[in-house]
């Protein structure tokens, strides 16, 4: 495979984590999930954790300054990674700079995302329809400029994410090999 630093983007419930894990396993590239990093931070009893919990549980994005520090700390020492869920804002894309070879956008309509979110039974506080719809709204508002940014730089690969996970992964595999 010709890419070593890959970002996987898409709306909540599109399958970012699933596809990132499949890519990671197939190509032996570490998977870094910004969502996992944030959820781990939320378990702590710090002031930052309280702020993150309040924002995430109401469907909003965690503050950039906290997320940037957590994610960049994790990936800066890595020569290869699959990063999912980051960047979500154009400023975050700027923080990554040239540390991205390819951005895979998993394109899924909102109703499919909501259905997946409500049906995944992971026990997450943000896995209900109302919060899911708000998360999709925030995603569409905040992330569209990021996708355009990577498209302008010739780094965006759009994949239809409405099929089964195996079918979606095969389309990704064919596109990146």
UniProtKB/Swiss-Prot annotation:
AMP binds at residues 34, 39, 60-62, 85-88, 92, 124, 135. It catalyses: AMP + ATP = 2 ADP. It is an enzyme of class 2 (transferase). ATP binds at residues 13-18, 120. InterPro entries: Adenylat/UMP-CMP_kin, Adenylat_kinase_CS, P-loop_NTPase. It is found in: Cytoplasm. One of its GO terms (cellular component) is cytoplasm. GO terms for molecular function: adenylate kinase activity; ATP binding. The keyword Coiled coil does not apply. Keywords: ATP-binding, Cytoplasm, Kinase, Nucleotide-binding, Transferase. Gene3D superfamilies: P-loop containing nucleotide triphosphate hydrolases (3.40.50.300). Residues 119-127 are annotated as: LID. Residues 33-62 are annotated as: NMP. Its EC number is 2.7.4.3. It holds the Pfam family ADK. The keyword Chaperone does not apply. Monomer. Belongs to the adenylate kinase family. Catalyzes the reversible transfer of the terminal phosphate group between ATP and AMP. Plays an important role in cellular energy homeostasis and in adenine nucleotide metabolism. This is Adenylate kinase.
